[in-house]
Amino acid sequence: MNSASIPEVQPAEPQAVLQALPAASVSKTVLSGRSGSKSVGTALWQWPLVFFGWCWRILAGGLLCFTLVGSILVTGWTYRWMQGLVLRGWWKRSRFRQEGSFEDFCASLGHDAPVARPRWLLQERMRTALNRLDAAGRQPSTVRKILRALRLPWHSLWLNFKIGFQGLFCTYLLTGLGCLIMLFSWEFGWLNSFNKGYEQALIGPLTGLLGIFVFIVAMVYVPMAQVHQAVTGDYRAFFDIRFVWRLIRARLSVYVILAALITLISLPLEILKTAPAFFGDWTESWSDAEVLKMLQNYYLICSLVLFVSLLIWRWLAARIYQSAVLKVLGRGWVTRAELHPTLANWLDRLDIFPVPTLESAGLTYLVKSGSRSVYRRTLYVLLFFIWFGFVAKVYVGQFLNYHPFEAFMNHPLVQFPHFNYIPSDLKS
């Protein structure tokens, strides 16, 4: 055979190679290329919108923390934000991260699915909410669309209020008793001291210690329960004690760090609350109207600091919850059937199935189990004293600048995110 008999081989065209690939590979290649270019474009032109969007949300949240009703809206908004954080964290672990954006995945869950940045007023996904099918699977009529359109301007406002009210109600069911006992001990102790009731001198301190203990026991549970209620969107989930307690055990080390963070960032807030007691030296010559105006501006700035502090600890709490759920599933502490339906649905849609792994019994297992038990008990003791410090700063602040009722009945980072301590006589 000579070289003339060998047919000349031409290089394959790129289009021919593409056609030779399986259909699934072609679609995946094209999709990845589009998503890659889309993500680059999003990073280039959308970041100013994201920046200004967050500036608006933080400013609005700070202003709302100045009023009691506004603090309910802030609570609901942060709950919705935590819900989006947790779902986004699981989405990043799934294959859907390579196939589209987080917004696309949430849109596939329905018009009421979580969002990365909740709105304060307008309804999320307006077009989808307006054109969704009715309960019978039929296209909505014109009248129904008009009725739905009436809710668009204020739906998020109502949602924030409803979720916030439910969250605060559940929180006070556990923490309110300790707050009431501490308030009683403080008021009774001072009244008894003024009236020289020496026979009842121990009632105030002893009831105060009881109130502190009851509040601390509640606070060991409350932060994780708040996130669980926020993520599931179900107020009854707050009292899913068995599941929440296993989440705490699964991530106990970082949960202690979370408690320390809450206590740490509450210190500047306590200082800001107490500081006006020392303003008297340079406001003596001011009129009541001038003092009122100054305090309003001061507490507005404090409210902004409170809102940012609230975002910080709830961001960390959402991250802890996100990993804790997967950990309890991976260790077999909770079966998939025991999950809240909302969590189970999300994990199913994301194709996330942690396989339970059990440690083999033996000497190594016994040593590890014993060391973990000692370590866990140490963390519980540390957690107790961290929350004790959280309460102790309130007593110190009360001695320096007395605030009746609200100082003991409301801890802004955990209960009502409200920061307005203007004296009532000055307001009137």
Language-model segment annotations:
Residues 2-212, 216-224, 228-263, 267-274, ...:
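Helix-coil boundary and N-terminal low-complexity module in membrane systems
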Residues 273-304, 399-408:
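Extracellular/periplasmic helix-loop-helix junctions in multi-pass membrane proteins
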